[in-house]
Curated annotation (Swiss-Prot):
Tissue specificity: Abundant expression in the male reproductive tract only. Abundant expressed in testis and the caput region of epididymis, but low in the corpus region.
Signal peptide segment: 1-21
Keyword line: Antibiotic, Antimicrobial, Defensin, Disulfide bond, Secreted, Signal
InterPro entries: Defensin_big_dom
UniProt organism field: Homo sapiens (Human)
Recorded GO CC terms: extracellular region
Function, as annotated: Has antibacterial activity.
Family, as annotated: Belongs to the beta-defensin family.
Name of the protein this chain belongs to: Beta-defensin 119
Compartment(s): Secreted
A Pfam family matched in the record: Defensin_big
Keyword Secreted in record: yes
Gene Ontology terms describing biological process: defense response to Gram-negative bacterium; defense response to Gram-positive bacterium
Length: 84
């Protein structure tokens, strides 16, 4: 009987516990967003994922619609025109 308890203890120590409710997170927009049925309060929906759920991006994410890398240098000189 002690051998059975020892075997069960070793078996439980080796196996990873199964957590119910833990699902694989589907990423979108180049791993910048998460596919969800509804976005959280601080997220904005953008396009749709393959499973017809919204691709939720953080509200501070900038999206380039031109397809090329944009200059993101937001220095003071680039924001305001020069005065003579």
């Amino acid at each position: 009987m002690k051998l059975l308890y020892l075997f069960l203890a070793i078996l439980l120590a080796i196996e990873e516990p199964v957590i119910s409710g833990k699902r694989h997170i589907l990423r979108c927009m180049g791993n910048s967003g998460i596919c969800r049925a509804s976005c959280k309060k601080n997220e904005q929906p953008y396009l749709y994922c393959r499973n017809c759920q919204s691709c939720c991006l953080q509200s501070y994410m900038r999206i380039s619609i031109s397809g090329k890398e944009e200059n993101t240098d937001w220095s003071y000189e680039k924001q305001w025109p020069r005065l003579p």
